[in-house]
């Protein structure tokens, strides 16, 4: 039986409060803060202008208990409450955003609950976007989490081992076409190590996929690396195997190549370039269908408070250009963000799209963010 969403929230709150009954002889600390954001968007799609407004509130409660100098128990719970209106219809939603209990020692970290799991050096076109869906255009960088347990161990040679087990995630994550089968956990791990002039990582994950008609086993294997060789250079590569003959393509390959550099002009112009190729085939080394996307980002700090940025994407298959321009002013607690965007009318899936980051059409968005 699937656990209702309200029950999940209640369980998370109870788990979060349990440490409050632990012996008061331990050093303990609670703190509460949050984020309030409001935005207005003017979007022209086809021949019509569509205006919308939104309001989001994310309260966050943190706690920590120190057993001794080498053992720490802490956690956090965040709720996501938002309202969005396009003046024709209203959308109000309330959901659990994060609920984490974390136990840390000098070399290990164990984390359980609704959490964010991400890795890899790419920033715009992320081959290793397996468990999140962070949109680089979104000023808030929000993404749904996953329910599970994640363990990290840091070795004395600065290498890091990750292990995770996920359960109860009934929605698609990252680039997934189908969700994970209910009541069947998925498992994975990652090993990061230092190499000359940089670092590299090897990642594995396996899960049971539910298409709605049948299930099959999916295995993913990934390799990534980053180097500092005067410029920053990195890659992410992944191979996905679907153990079934009932889908058209049993193999999917993705690779991202990227680099960045800061020019000593004025306050410093930061450039980043990435290119992603994805291939689907019925054989491991086949090439039945492919797609290529390139991206460039440039940022420049006008002052201590002001920063401007531009992101441009090119879809080689659809020959479409996606443009996003941003100005942001940052105070101690306030952020003002103005975004201008120009996307194809019929976007082909580069961006998923949301109320704070449209995926098609052109227009502008003003957002105010208050952190306390």
Residue ranges and their predicted role:
Residues 26-47, 73-75, 159:
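Transmembrane beta-strand segments of Gram-negative outer membrane beta-barrel proteins
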Residues 30, 69-75, 107-110, 158-162, ...:
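Repeated loop/turn-to-beta-strand initiation elements of outer-membrane beta-barrel proteins
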Residues 38-44, 67, 79-85, 105-107, ...:
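Transmembrane beta-strands of outer-membrane beta-barrel pores
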Residues 49-57, 92-97, 143-147, 183-187, ...:
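Residues that define the transmembrane beta-barrel architecture of outer-membrane proteins
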Residues 59-65, 98-103, 149-153, 189-193, ...:
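Residues on the lipid-exposed face of transmembrane beta-strands in outer-membrane beta-barrel proteins
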Residues 64-161, 166, 345:
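Outer membrane beta-barrel
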Residues 195, 226-315:
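Detector for outer-membrane/organellar transmembrane beta-barrel domains
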Residues 329, 334-335, 342, 358-372:
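Outer-membrane beta-barrel "beta-signal"
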């Amino acid at each position: 039986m699937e656990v209702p969403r309200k029950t999940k929230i209640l369980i998370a709150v109870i788990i979060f409060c349990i440490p409050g009954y632990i012996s008061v002889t331990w050093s303990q600390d609670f703190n509460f803060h949050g984020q309030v954001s409001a935005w207005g968007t003017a979007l022209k799609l086809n021949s019509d202008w569509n205006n919308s407004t939104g309001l989001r509130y994310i309260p966050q409660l943190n706690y920590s208990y120190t057993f001794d100098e080498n053992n720490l128990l802490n956690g956090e719970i965040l709720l996501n409450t938002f309202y969005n209106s396009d003046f024709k219809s209203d959308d109000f939603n309330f959901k659990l955003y994060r609920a984490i209990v974390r136990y840390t020692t000098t070399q290990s970290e164990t984390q359980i609950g609704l959490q964010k799991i991400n890795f890899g050096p790419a920033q715009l076109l992320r081959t290793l976007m397996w468990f999140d869906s962070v949109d680089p255009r979104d000023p808030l960088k929000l993404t749904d989490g996953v329910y599970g347990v994640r363990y990290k161990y840091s070795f004395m040679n600065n290498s890091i081992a990750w292990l995770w087990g996920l359960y109860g995630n009934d929605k698609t994550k990252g680039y997934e076409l189908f969700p994970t089968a209910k009541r069947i956990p998925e498992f994975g791990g990652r090993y990061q190590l230092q190499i000359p002039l940089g670092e590299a990582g090897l990642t594995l994950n396996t899960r049971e996929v539910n298409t709605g008609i049948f299930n099959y086993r999916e295995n993913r294997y990934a390799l990534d690396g980053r180097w500092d060789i005067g410029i920053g250079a990195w890659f992410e590569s992944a191979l996905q195997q679907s153990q079934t003959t009932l889908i058209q393509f049993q193999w999917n390959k993705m690779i991202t190549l990227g680099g960045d550099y800061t020019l000593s002009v004025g306050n410093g112009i930061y450039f980043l370039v990435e290119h992603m190729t994805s291939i689907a085939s019925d054989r491991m080394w086949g090439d039945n269908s492919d797609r290529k996307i390139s991206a460039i980002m440039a940022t420049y700090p006008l002052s201590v408070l002001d920063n401007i940025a531009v992101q441009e994407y090119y879809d080689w298959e659809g020959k479409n250009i996606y443009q996003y321009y941003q100005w942001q002013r940052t105070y101690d607690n306030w952020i003002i963000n103005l975004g201008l965007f120009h996307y194809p009318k019929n976007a082909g899936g580069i961006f998923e799209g949301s109320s704070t980051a449209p995926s098609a059409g052109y227009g502008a968005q003003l957002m105010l963010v208050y952190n306390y």
